Amino acid sequence: MLDSVTLNAMTSAMNGYSATQNAIANNLANIDTPNYKAQEVNFASALAQSVAAGSGALPESAFTPTQSLDPTQLNGNNVSISDETLEEIDTGLKFQLASQAATQQFSEIQTAAEMS
């Protein structure tokens, strides 16, 4: 059964994965830009704490990209195409899973409504 914590958590997760995809796109677009520092979005621990606290909702600030502290190359850039590609695949799959879970929850609600 769908509850507000579950819905909030799925919405927050999809927002976080979307922000992560945007950060990855920015990183790949700046792969040859001298002194560019890769961006990353770290929202998973905040989401886990929010769910544990009974909310599941996260503020927009939780999805703000931060600069990566990974070592830089000679030109001062720290974007790794292999790391970004793997992160893009992982994030896409996680977004897809959260989206499917939300769809399933809404389908159950619709079925219950039709039966009553």
Identify the function of each model-found stretch.
Residues 1-116:
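Amphipathic alpha-helical polymerization modules
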